Amino acid sequence: MSENQVIKPGGRLVGEVQVPGDKSISHRAIMLGALGEGETVVRGLLRGEDNLATLEAFRSMGVAFCEDGDGALRIAGRGLHGLQEPQDVIDCGNSGTTMRLMTGLLAGQQFFSVMTGDRFLRKRPMKRVVGPLTAMGAHILGRAGGEYAPLALQGKTLQGITHHSAVASAQVKSALLLGGLYAEGPTTVHEPHRSRDHSERMLTWFGADVRPFEGGVTLHPGSCLKGGEVIVPGDISSAAFFMVAALIVPGSELLIRQVGVNPTRSGVIDILRQMGGNIELLNERDCSGEPVADILVKASDLKGVEIGGAVIPRAIDEFPVISVAAAFAEGRTVIRDARELRVKETDRIASMCSQMGALGALVEPREDGMVITGGPSLGAAKVSSLGDHRIGMSMAVAALRASAPVTVTDTECTATSFPGFWELFNSVREH
């Protein structure tokens, strides 16, 4: 049954908040923990639906998991060659990360496997990973010539390649690096811009021979992965909703604790600062190879800016809520070079234009982005998540500056990346 949330405008955000663990890092911790020798203990793991899909995929291949009393996840690693052939189709749910990264990993196994997903995932492009993996010798079948799931894989030994990626995609890069663990010879990926590097960092943490260079990365196979402890920081994509909310609601001052601030992911901080946002990083430190900080955000008068180029892949998941910030900034904000937004859980350019437009925002779609003309406030209306977790949470933030309560429909999807979002969102607001 569809869930709805009614958001009343106003209510400054004050105090402290800690967001759930990083979704991208959680996926990779499960995957590499399963492939590692010995036990891996993961602390701070996100229990969102996407990550649970990854966990269940490995459970179906014989990996044992158990929960500690303190909330940590213990993974009994089976080593690089210890996975078992799954007896049923692997259901990736709504998770593009699960499907794309698993495609690389499964391509190098010595068994047969099939992956599918929900109606949204089955519309998302997979050829971008299927194509280069096929060049490595993988045998993968899918709808429309491998463009769409379900995907069927007959695993085999792969050959390392040098791949020049047309887009800066961490999922493509990660799929090839995971396939490269099972390849003869090195695997090299070149990118037009640097994408998030969580896979490289965690592969290195587990003992793989990964060599980043300007414009790309090379993995040399042959190293076994060693289990250990992984501490997952808070997800900057989840923190972004609270950052924008605190910036746009007058009188707000919010401290967001223990957030991952990896430079390949912190584009949202750079963009919001460029817009005039008062954002400060405190207590900077390192956890399991990832930079972490506490983020102090104070309400600010924002201004419109131009956003494009190398910052786009560093903030690709945050553009729905960045567009909310732009709706309250003085002047025009132009987002370009972001065509990748059209192939997310929904077409996020069309989704944000339609839902923000319903509230009266001046948002104009472009093929590779949008133009937003800011104003002091929005109207009130019933809006929808459209089944996309980031759209739903972005509309909740927009509602804080509406003229009357806003109803957001179909909000159950927020559990994909942020279970407990609505409770946390309400807890930091003064009523």
Curated annotation (Swiss-Prot):
Xref: CDD domains: EPSP_synthase (cd01556)
EC number(s) from the headed UniProt entry: 2.5.1.19
Recorded GO CC terms: cytoplasm
Residue numbers annotated as active site: D317 (proton acceptor)
GO biological process: amino acid biosynthetic process; aromatic amino acid family biosynthetic process; chorismate biosynthetic process
Keywords per UniProt: Amino-acid biosynthesis, Aromatic amino acid biosynthesis, Cytoplasm, Transferase
Catalytic activity: 3-phosphoshikimate + phosphoenolpyruvate = 5-O-(1-carboxyvinyl)-3-phosphoshikimate + phosphate
Localization in the cell: Cytoplasm
Group of enzyme by EC: transferase
Assembly: Monomer.
Role of this protein: Catalyzes the transfer of the enolpyruvyl moiety of phosphoenolpyruvate (PEP) to the 5-hydroxyl of shikimate-3-phosphate (S3P) to produce enolpyruvyl shikimate-3-phosphate and inorganic phosphate.
Family that this chain belongs to: Belongs to the EPSP synthase family.
Descriptive protein name: 3-phosphoshikimate 1-carboxyvinyltransferase
Gene: aroA
